[in-house]
Structure formats: structure tokens, C-alpha cells
Amino acid sequence: MLYLDANVFIYAAINTEEIGEKARTLLQKIQQGEEKAATSALTFDEVFWSIKKRKPELAIETSYALLNFPNMEIIPADRKLAVFALEIIKEYNLAPRDALHAATALAAKADCIVSTDPHFDKLKELKRQLL
């Protein structure tokens, strides 16, 4: 199972270059059931605000698509994950949002995190997959 960082959805929605195409291809594979995926409920916030800053007309549509995406579990952020994220912050000095994504991916037993963010490379317990 793949854990999707917010940047996968952002690139898919607004990037017209190769990385945007790769993100759209990955999401299509998930949609068709070729891959299973998960992401945090917090991804909604990141995706909405990032897209709203660049292409406000796409923010709501993209957010609805994310929240209703087939073959993808949306994992709630809770106290247990927040405590786990604090442990990750302490050990790897990640930003809180990145640590929450890492904690969520690890708790969900994801095979890897799909992200363009190199901060995730610090974690020995979680492999990062590029788009």
C-alpha cells in the first residue's frame, strides 16, 4: 500500500510538466484499483490551501475529488498519531506536518511514502518513492 503525501495531489491538479503527468498517472492506477493507497485527513488542508493560492477555482473541486477518491483510505489524525509524530520529531527533527504524515504512513503499515519531499529520507523505517 502506498501512502500519498499532499504534493502528489497538488502536482496532479496544477502542474503541467512531467511531474504533474506522473502524479496523474499514479492516481489513475489507484483509481483503477492497480494500487491501493492511503493518506491523512490532514492532506485535505494542505491540498486545499496550496491549490487555492495558485488556482482558486480548482481548490474545492480538487478537495472533493481527494476526499472521495476510490481505492484510497483517508486516515483520521488523532491523539495516538500526534504522540507518535512527536517521537518522530524528536528522533528525526521533522516539521510537525511531515512527522504526522510519517506517523500515519507507519501506523498504516504503508510500503512507502510517495512524495517529492526529501525530508522523509531521514526516516530509516519508511522508504520514500519519487513520482
Residue ranges and their predicted role:
Residues 1-39, 52-61:
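Short, well-structured N-terminal submotif of metal-dependent ribonuclease cores
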Residues 6, 41, 79, 98-102:
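Conserved glycosyltransferase catalytic-site signature
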Residues 15, 70-91:
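Acidic catalytic patch
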Residues 45-48, 86:
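Amphipathic alpha-helical segments within well-ordered protein domains
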